[in-house]
Amino acid sequence: MTQPSSGGIKRECNSCSSEHFPRVNPVVIMLIISNNKVLLGRGKGWPEGAMSALAGFISPGETIEEAVKRETYEEVGIKIKNAQYVFSQPWPWPSQLMIGMVCEADNEDLNINTDEIEEAKWFTKDQVKAVYDNSGDHFLKLPKFTIAHHLLRNWIES
C-alpha cells in the first residue's frame, strides 16, 4: 500500500519506504478562433448546453502544436494555423497537465466527429462576454478554477 506525500507529487510505500512518482499525462486544450468567434464543443456525456474549449491527449512523439492540429481535425474537421501557447494548469483528475493554446481556424465549416464529441458551435465574442457578465445564455459558465475559463476570459478581454 502506498500513501501520497509531498503534496501528491509522489507516493511512498508503507512497508519498504520506496518512492513512486505518478505519471503525468499532457493534454492540449485550445481556443480555436475565426473572425472574432470562438469554437466550443460539448464532450460525450456532458449535460445538454455545457460547452468548453476542445481538448485532447498528446500522443507519444507528438509536439504540442501537432497535437492541437490533430485533435482539432479529429474532433471537428478543421485545419488550424498559428497555434500559440498561453498558459498551463495541473489537473489532478487523472494526473494531467493541461496546456492552454490559442489558434486560428482555416475555415468555419464544421465536420463534427460524434465519436469524439457531442456537438460544436461557433460563438461570437459578445455571446461569450454576455455569459461572463451574467447577462447571456449560460452555455458555458465554466468554474473559475478551470483553464478553459481563463482561456476564454483572456480572449474576451483582448
What are the functions of these language-model segments?
Residues 26-37, 42-54:
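Histidine/lysine/aspartate-rich catalytic loop segments that bind and position anionic ligands
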Residues 38, 59-65:
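Glycine-rich phosphate/ribose-binding loops and adjacent secondary-structure elements
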Residues 79-86:
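A short coil-to-beta-strand element that immediately follows conserved catalytic motifs
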Residues 89-112:
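Active-site-adjacent beta-strand/loop module that shapes the phosphate/pyrophosphate-binding cleft
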